[in-house]
Amino acid sequence: IINTFWIVPKTTFLFQNNSEDRRGFLDHMISSVDSDYKKNLSNYDKFKSERIKILKRWNNNQLEWVKLIEKKLASYGVIICDARRNFLKELNQNLNTFSSIFPSLQLELSGELDKLLLKSPAVEVEDFFLRKLEENRNKDILMGKTNFSVNKTDLLAFDIDSMTDARSFSTGEQKIIIFSIIFSFIKLLESNSNLNIIFFS
């Protein structure tokens, strides 16, 4: 199987774009190396949409069905968070090897679930997610969307020495940071001989 990875013009403006673009960039990299990740994202989106549809026509007879969907949503959500966490861990290790060429960088995720997963077992994070989904039902009905979700996170990059957010750097400096992330990703691919990926720009 040969996967493809596209580097589009707006990639060079990643840290000037919105969080959805940065999250999509991260998810695209992970999907290139983990065939299950894209399926998990798809399943997560499917259950998220299904939950909103049911909540919009809510009645007490649907409570058990909503609980079942929320359980699925929380389960896939934690799997996605964990995959992102593990991938960033590898990227950060590779970024350290480029510190003599590029700025010393640390990549992080801003999401509440992402941060919780760094210090708590996955089962506890899943339970926390379930509680948030239950607490937010009325709010989600009113707004017609899932207000607490793994798709609310943002990819952050910091200069390790100054702890300056990449979004504060100049356009030229941001492009250097983006290239260093891509080189780190390529290094990750080189360490896995089972992966066949074609890059397009």
Language model features with spans:
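Conserved NTPase motor "head" modules and their coupling/switch loops across ABC/AAA+ ATPases, GTPases
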Residues: 60-200
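Generic secondary-structure boundary/loop-capping signal
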Residues: 4, 11-12, 34, 52, ...
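Nucleotide-state sensing region of NTPase/ATPase domains
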Residues: 1-21, 25-37, 92-96, 125, ...
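Long, contiguous hydrophobic alpha-helical segments, chiefly transmembrane helices and signal peptides
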Residues: 2-7, 14-15, 25-30, 44, ...
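Long, non-coiled-coil amphipathic alpha-helical linker/lever segments
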Residues: 26, 33-84
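Alpha-helix initiation/capping motif
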Residues: 14-15, 40, 122, 146
